Regions:
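Activation targets extended, charge/polar-rich intrinsically disordered C-terminal tails
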Residues: 2-13, 19-32, 132-208
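A structural motif
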Residues: 117-131
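Alpha-helical recognition domains of nuclear gene-regulatory proteins
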Residues: 80, 88, 127-130, 155-159
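Surface-exposed beta-strand-to-loop junctions
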Residues: 104-106, 129-136
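Alpha-helical and coiled-coil interaction segments, frequently adjacent to or embedded
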Residues: 13-14, 80
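Plant-biased recognition of short, low-complexity, intrinsically disordered N-terminal tails
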Residues: 1-9, 20, 37, 49-58
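Glycine-rich catalytic cores of cysteine/serine-nucleophile enzymes that process amide/ester linkages
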Residues: 38, 44, 52-115
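Short Cys/His-rich micro-motifs in 6-15 aa windows
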Residues: 30-40
């Protein structure tokens, strides 16, 4: 699990101080943070990253190489998969369909399906089980550019289209624009904060 980001105000209501560990001395006023009162006590900033095994019937994404916090850039290739009701990951790559991958502990969750009923949960599990055995998704059929993980996930969503806005499934570019980019853009703000704190020990942020 990544180091958690904490936010607090010490001496000024105009500036937030973000850090992993509360500094002994306030970077704004230079006073001891242990012996002086804080305007706002430390609280956790919720991370957008999650362990895929804790999700249910969700689209999940992660960098193809490395992880979001330390390696991701806007130019990074992203790998995409789907979880079933038990949080088991179904992914398609050069190995074909892999079930139960363990390297999804730091991913972004995309709730394309919205609020689900028991009927939809059952359909998700059934659809994934069928697709995992379908010859369309064997390693021989995989192509990095024309038949990849995005095609697998989009076909899964088409198969349960009664709970998905099908407009986003018309093309891979439209799917990325409407579904993936909003999630990665929001996560990018957290990742930027994380990296600044990892380098400088804290981040001083103007209150909006």
């Amino acid at each position: 699990m990544e180091t958690e980001i904490r936010c607090f105000q010490h001496c000024s209501r105009d500036w937030n101080i973000l850090c992993f560990t509360i500094p002994d001395v306030c970077p704004l006023c230079g006073h001891d943070t242990m012996t002086t009162e804080m305007r706002i006590p430390p609280y956790l900033i919720q991370s957008p990253l999650t362990d895929a095994n804790t999700t249910q019937c969700c689209v999940v994404i992660k960098p193809t190489i490395g992880c979001f916090l330390t390696d991701y850039t806007n130019q990074s290739n992203l790998h995409i998969a789907v979880t079933n009701t038990a949080g088991v990951v179904y992914e398609f790559d050069e190995r074909g369909v892999t079930v139960g991958g363990s390297d999804w502990t730091q991913c972004l969750q995309v709730n394309v399906l919205g609020i689900l009923s028991e009927t939809v949960y059952k359909k998700c599990d059934e659809t994934l089980a069928i697709m995992a055995q379908n010859e369309t998704w064997t390693k021989e059929k995989y192509n990095e550019f024309s038949h990849n993980c995005y095609d697998f996930v989009m076909q899964f969503l088409r198969n349960i289209s009664n709970v998905v806005k099908t407009g986003c499934l018309e093309s891979r570019s439209l799917f990325c624009e409407q579904v993936i980019v909003p999630v990665t853009s929001k996560a990018g703000k957290y990742i930027s904060m994380y990296r600044t704190i990892a380098t400088d020990r804290y981040l001083i942020q103007k209150v909006a």
